[in-house]
A protein has these predicted regions:
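Small-residue (G/A/S/T)-rich helix-start motifs and N-terminal tracts that mark the onset
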Residues: 4-92, 101-118, 123-248
Length: 248
């Protein structure tokens, strides 16, 4: 669970707080230096426990934006936590990966949110959200994304080739990105960028569009400099800061 506040991590001036199971504290502190760490109680599966819910709810009051789902895990505790975050957060929430999987049994929770929501499913997650096949999703991406966003009052980022971003009314189809970005970590990077832009004051739809475009452009430049086969998520992250200066 990432809580963002301030000017945005891509500018190295954001306040970023990471909420995570206590047992991974040594790993977090040995690899990251920028975030504020907020370790909380965990269950037997080493994921966030229901006992951490009060602490997480308190942390929501600190944030300008919340991103939840990346590496979260799937069990009863995480389902309760994600649903409660959606219902109680007064700031925008970005749902990715297991954050999306955690609402599959209670999609109506999206309609009970107090604050704006952004969902970032890949085609498989989108298929599970609407009870369809991946082939059905891929055959009608724009209509399906737009309908879901309209029915659930959210911004939807349907990832893939030509990522679709929609608020249920307007639609943006992205033209940046390449097959080399189909690797672990790129979706997490995008989620963080969307959350960062929202924390800087952008509305959710604009933040999602900008993040998707710049994220894809970052991947394209990385592929040009290295190769689509050889590029890594670390290569993209190393390039992002310099790329952002082009948009100031």
């Amino acid at each position: 669970c990432l809580l963002s506040r301030g000017l945005g991590d891509v500018y190295k001036r954001q306040l970023l707080k990471c909420v995570f199971p206590r047992s991974v504290y040594p790993v977090m502190t040995s690899h990251l230096v920028q975030p504020v760490f907020s370790p909380v109680s965990e269950n037997e599966e080493k994921t966030l426990s229901i006992g951490s819910l009060n602490r997480i709810t308190e942390e929501l009051e600190w944030a300008d934006c919340v991103a939840i789902g990346c590496g979260l895990g799937k069990n009863d505790d995480t389902q309760v936590i994600v649903n409660q975050v959606i219902r109680s957060s007064e700031v925008p929430v970005v749902l990715d990966a297991d954050g999306i999987n955690s609402i599959l049994l209670n999609i109506d929770v999206l309609k009970n949110a107090h604050a704006p929501l952004v969902l970032t499913p890949h085609p498989g997650e989108m298929a599970r959200l609407i009870g369809a096949s991946v082939a059905q999703v891929e055959s009608d991406r724009i209509r399906i994304a737009k309908q879901f966003a309209a029915e659930n009052s959210c911004v939807l980022v349907l990832k893939g080739a030509n990522t679709v971003v929609t608020d249920g009314n307007s639609v943006f189809v992205n033209v940046t990105g390449n097959p080399g970005m189909a690797m672990g970590g790129t979706g997490d990077m995008l989620t963080g960028m969307i959350g960062s832009f929202i924390a800087q004051g952008m509305d959710c739809y604009s933040a999602a569009k900008c993040a998707v475009y710049i994220h894809g452009l970052c991947g394209d430049i990385t592929a040009q400099e290295i190769s689509t086969r050889g590029m890594t998520i670390e290569d993209m992250l190393d390039l992002l800061g310099a790329l952002m200066s082009e948009f100031e």
